[in-house]
């Protein structure tokens, strides 16, 4: 895993490509799946308090997390007028990385009229973890995308130290490739250890949540999200409009993973309520 042997296999690439279509009955379904190790795709679920016809799937890792030198690529393609919810069955562990960092790239394509929710659980950063997370969104007319990118820290018994770094790059583009909005985050373990007031203080779990789409009632969404998140204790919260009329962004920082998960559910439930009129219940995982 992290041995110093020169024979260690690194720079491994793994890909999962999942596409969704809408049946004549109105039900969304998985119409294509090419899923390689370490990804595992569960069966499609129909969950209570989801919009009618929505397909819900859970991705899992068969390898036990992210390791040094890995390059993972996940592509989700929501066809016209589909409704799709994608999450993970558990949090992903980014293990200590002594040789090389890991990279995870997620490509989200939402075609005309689609609703695509990509809401994985937070990544858990172990000491010396070094992870670069990239999310690329292609937004077609009248499409809506909900997404989050989140991490928290954990030191297993018998271990010590800080994460190396967490870097996140997010790009939202139109089908022609024009950049509509971008977000960039870079933090090191040393940054968090400083615990600067107004920057991170004692907080060690961070998430970015976005509702992406054009012609949304942005001011109404910002008010609703701020009201929904007021109840989150001991947190830093920020809600802002994305440029080029492409949605709303929420930054959340909390003391731990439990509070972060609760805050992300509140943000998701609020956004889903505003879009569909139906708020989702808390999912047991």
Swiss-Prot record:
* UniProt GO MF annotations: nickel cation binding
Mention any one GO cellular component term assigned to this protein in its UniProt record: cytoplasm
Keyword Cytoplasm assigned to the entry: answer is: yes
A Pfam family annotated for this chain is UreD
Where in the cell? Answer: Cytoplasm
Q: Taking the first listed entry, what is the main subcellular location of this protein, grouped into a coarse class? A: cytoplasm
Which keywords label this protein? Chaperone, Cytoplasm, Nickel insertion
Q: What does this protein do?
A: Required for maturation of urease via the functional incorporation of the urease nickel metallocenter.
Q: Which HAMAP family match?
A: UreD (MF_01384)
Could you say which protein family the record assigns here? Belongs to the UreD family.
Q: How does it assemble?
A: UreD, UreF and UreG form a complex that acts as a GTP-hydrolysis-dependent molecular chaperone, activating the urease apoprotein by helping to assemble the nickel containing metallocenter of UreC. The UreE protein probably delivers the nickel.
Protein name listed in UniProt: Urease accessory protein UreD 1
